[in-house]
Amino acid sequence: MSPAIAVEIKRLPHAEGLPLPAYQSAHAAGLDLCAANSADAPLSLAPGCHMLVPTGLCIALPPNYEAQVRPRSGLAAKHGVTVLNAPGTIDADYRGEIGVLLINHGKEPFTIRRGERIAQMIIAPVVRAELISVETLSETARGVGGFGSTGR
């Protein structure tokens, strides 16, 4: 496992009393993010609809790092609820609130309660590319075959 990096986190007023993102097991890759909606106003996500769910958190990533917001497998498997823009990218220079864009692919409305774990956040290094314009690319066995060209 790589050594931990320091990431500053700011809790906004509507996240008071909620736990900070946390790893749920010794070797978990993602920190669970919780919904920071009002306790007396659960959110209802209708089938086929999407919604931006607040977390009440802002982070300051070190340069050359990103955070990815990904689905929680249990929500997807049990309820058909997933992150619409998975993975959502949080750049190192973004300082706004982390929002989770959820979509309900299930058949029933899904209720999002305050403090419910709704997504996971993976922090990873970023490699920046230097693009070089060329007239031709090197040949490969695959060539230009895409979408399904290597099998079903």
Swiss-Prot record:
Substrate binds at residues 72-74, 85, 89-91. Its EC number is 3.6.1.23. The keyword Aminoacyl-tRNA synthetase does not apply. Keywords: Hydrolase, Magnesium, Metal-binding, Nucleotide metabolism. Pathway: Pyrimidine metabolism; dUMP biosynthesis; dUMP from dCTP (dUTP route): step 2/2. GO terms for molecular function: dUTP diphosphatase activity; magnesium ion binding. The keyword Metal-binding applies. Pfam families: dUTPase. It comes from Rhodopseudomonas palustris (strain HaA2). This is Deoxyuridine 5'-triphosphate nucleotidohydrolase. InterPro entries: dUTPase, dUTPase-like, dUTPase-like_sf, dUTPase_trimeric. Belongs to the dUTPase family. This enzyme is involved in nucleotide metabolism: it produces dUMP, the immediate precursor of thymidine nucleotides and it decreases the intracellular concentration of dUTP so that uracil cannot be incorporated into DNA. GO terms for biological process: dUMP biosynthetic process; dUTP catabolic process. It catalyses: dUTP + H2O = dUMP + diphosphate + H(+). It is an enzyme of class 3 (hydrolase).
